[in-house]
Amino acid sequence: VVLDPACGSGMQLFSYCARLGRPGLGIELDSDAALLAAANGKRVWDADGGDWGAKTQVVFGDGTDAAAVLAEAGLPERPIAVLHVDPARPQDAQRHSLDEMQPPLSELVGSWADHLAEGPVGPAIIIDLSPRLSDAQREEVGDILGARWQDSPITWEWVSKGQGRIDRLTVWFGGAADAHSPARMLRLLTDGSVVRFAGESITATTDISSTPQPGQWLTIVDSALLSSGLQQQWLRKAISHRSPSRWLRTDGRRPLLLTDIPLRMDDPKVSSFVSTTGEIMSQAKLPPNEAGIESILVSARSAYLARLTLRCSLSPGLQPILQQALDKGLKIHPRGKQGFLIDADTPDGPGWFICRAP
């Protein structure tokens, strides 16, 4: 049986049931939601045509009271092949403890542990978590699961639709995990295809030992990739392993990579994780403010840019003023290339770089 102890509408549960061909057990504390879930289960079963639906149940009750639920459902002692849960959680997950999820994770695992069928690597557990979970909270989740099943594998999965946002964070544990891939990154593309990286998660480190020079390339990389720690696998696709590269920034919304050569942007595995990339034309002599905008315009015109997009940290009030001034000042090169202005730390302090897109 596939168990979801907080099934809500039941759609995720029934999706797993249809995919695995196994009956499901959904538990819902809200009676109206339980009725909706039961109706959804019937609809999915009718569309799928499998035989799993005949033994699928939705129980109105407390998902942390395993014994009572199993008794009501008339199921044996260890009937659960897969436990999946997407607990309700506070919006600002980093400011709350894991036990503020509903149902609380530690209580849930403790209640169901003795009722999970265990294979060679432990039970199969899938937990959807807040995409904003901190590293410390992820470690806490691992500790909760590992306390009961010390040697079971664990796979953390990040899912992103782009724009530097993590759309889903899931932990796959025990029989549900990929024993060879502690981390997995899925990038969902608009055409329905998926770009996938998997392997060991490695924390990226910054290197601002020297100032970026004209002719080098700056690339803003999707922050979701660095959250997964799989940026080295991506980098091996992006440039030759013989070509040097270093991270100028690894946190925030604009992780910044410096390379000596352009990236292989014709490869979807590379381009799908790139926000913008360009060749450094010059370093701005003055910072982007109302006093320095004319100097930046001179450099942009010298690079024959038709547009220079601000990709640096600016106050919300100043950004549109400066962007309007740049747009107006670059009308003389309507057939020029696109460019961007990006900030980066250097050994001499903050720097701003004018880059031209390929």
Regions found by a protein language model. Name each.
Residues 1-358:
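SAM-dependent transferase fold signal centered on methyltransferase-like domains
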